[in-house]
């Protein structure tokens, strides 16, 4: 996609998204996800100013056609592509009815490999809630590999990547976030099941901790009651 390109490339991208909306409507797709493409030499601010009317018209086109699919803008991992989390959030804020697609490996690469603990994932959810008031989140997950200069090269299986899905699962479960996570891994189905397994393990450990804490509190209350009875 190249929504910031010359007239031909921009119009071609618009036609692709119109067609995606038509097909998505036929199959009952809930979301139509798109990248924006390269900056083509313009600033981030100018890019957003150009994109807003394009996607306002596209949103209106979907509504006029009766399409129920939501347009989602996916984060980009490379710095020459439009798609930082702040850019995508601002675009969604200005084009009502659209939403971000949080691609975790792209975000990790774009942010100089910073998704390395639970708190870093939590900050993303906090930012999206504060900026857009989101209560539902649509995300993509996989491993990611880098070239010798530290630039994003390609997706990898989750076990070979440096982003730990356990951290994401813990943050989702502990905060009760409503999150749909899609596997972008080269081992798509395998890693989808792997993420499900990790989530179940995290939830099991979480419930065990809660049970132990509740049992400990009951013991304390029982001992306190016994002491008072004396």
Predicted regions and their residues:
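Glycine-rich phosphate-binding "P-loop"
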Residues: 150-162
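C-terminal accessory extensions appended to soluble enzyme cores
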Residues: 169-230
């Amino acid at each position: 996609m190249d929504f910031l390109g010359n007239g031909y490339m921009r119009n071609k991208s618009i036609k692709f998204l119109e067609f995606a909306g038509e097909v998505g409507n036929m199959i009952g797709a809930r979301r139509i996800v798109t990248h924006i493409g390269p900056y083509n030499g313009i600033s981030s601010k100018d890019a957003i100013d150009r994109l807003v009317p394009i996607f306002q018209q596209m949103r209106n086109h979907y509504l006029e056609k009766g399409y129920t699919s939501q347009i989602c803008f996916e984060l980009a991992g490379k710095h020459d592509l439009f798609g930082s989390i702040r850019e995508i959030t601002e675009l969604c804020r200005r084009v009502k009815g659209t939403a971000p697609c949080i691609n975790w490996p792209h975000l990790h690469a774009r942010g100089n490999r910073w998704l390395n603990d639970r708190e870093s994932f939590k900050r993303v959810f906090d930012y999206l809630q504060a900026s857009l008031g989101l209560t539902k989140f649509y995300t993509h997950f996989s491993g990611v590999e880098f070239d010798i200069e530290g630039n994003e090269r390609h997706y990898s299986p989750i076990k070979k990547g440096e982003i730990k899905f356990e951290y994401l699962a813990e943050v989702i479960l502990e905060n009760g976030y409503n999150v749909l996570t899609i596997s972008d891994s080269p081992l798509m189905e395998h890693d989808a099941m792997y993420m499900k397994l990790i989530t179940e393990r995290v939830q099991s450990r979480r419930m065990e901790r809660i049970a132990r804490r509740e049992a400990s509190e009951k013991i304390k209350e029982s001992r306190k009651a016994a002491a008072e009875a004396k």
